[in-house]
Regions:
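Conserved beta-sheet core of the metallophosphoesterase superfamily
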Residues: 101-168
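Short, Lys/Arg-enriched N-terminal segments with co-localized hydrophobic residues
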Residues: 1-7
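Core catalytic region of metal-dependent phosphoesterases/phosphodiesterases
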Residues: 9-15, 19-114
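Short, well-ordered loop/turn elements at secondary-structure boundaries
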Residues: 7-8, 137
């Protein structure tokens, strides 16, 4: 008989989920619109977790470009919720991340992840740093977070903040 073939594992990238960060619902973008249009923090958490679970399979890899969550009881929340999300999770550390709390929930934690054609960072790399990388190796797309609703710098940058990827 014919053998079923396993789907290729995929890599997904997301950043700045800010799980449990109630105050982020008050933040406005540069046009004065709310950055995140959710009624409350539970609704925001649920939406992001549902979206994640709807596209990521257990064999997939998820690169999180930092700023995972806020608030108290981090480890309890991570254990009850984040740990159940599918995928092999890798973290590029963000400016709000506590490695001690997050380490048990990620396969690895890096300051950046360098892969063929891509460099994953939390904040966008300075253009001179990116130019330097291009001189020695093949050109890379800098996949980053941190800037939320703001546009990426000109050039080979891609923002994967949840606000810019439909929270998925």
């Amino acid at each position: 008989g014919t053998q079923g073939h396993k789907a290729m594992a995929k890599t997904f990238v997301i950043s700045d989920t800010h799980f449990n960060h109630a105050n982020i619902l008050e933040f406005k973008d540069y046009l004065g619109k709310p950055c995140r249009e959710f009624d409350n923090v539970d609704q925001m958490n649920e939406a992001m977790m549902d979206n994640w679970a709807s596209v990521v399979s257990p064999e997939d890899t998820v690169i999180h470009c930092g700023d995972v969550l806020f608030g108290m009881d981090k480890v309890d929340w991570l254990t009850a919720n984040f740990a159940k999300l599918p995928g092999k999770k890798r973290l590029v550390i963000g400016n709000h991340d506590n490695v001690k709390h997050l380490a048990p929930f990620f396969k690895d934690i890096q300051l950046w992840i360098d892969m063929p054609g891509f460099i994953f960072t939390h904040t966008p790399l300075h253009e001179s740093t990116l130019a330097e990388a291009h001189r020695f190796k093949e050109p890379k797309l800098n996949v980053h977070g941190h800037i939320h609703t703001n546009p990426s710098p000109e050039g080979p940058y891609k923002c994967v903040c949840v606000e810019q990827i439909n929270y998925t």
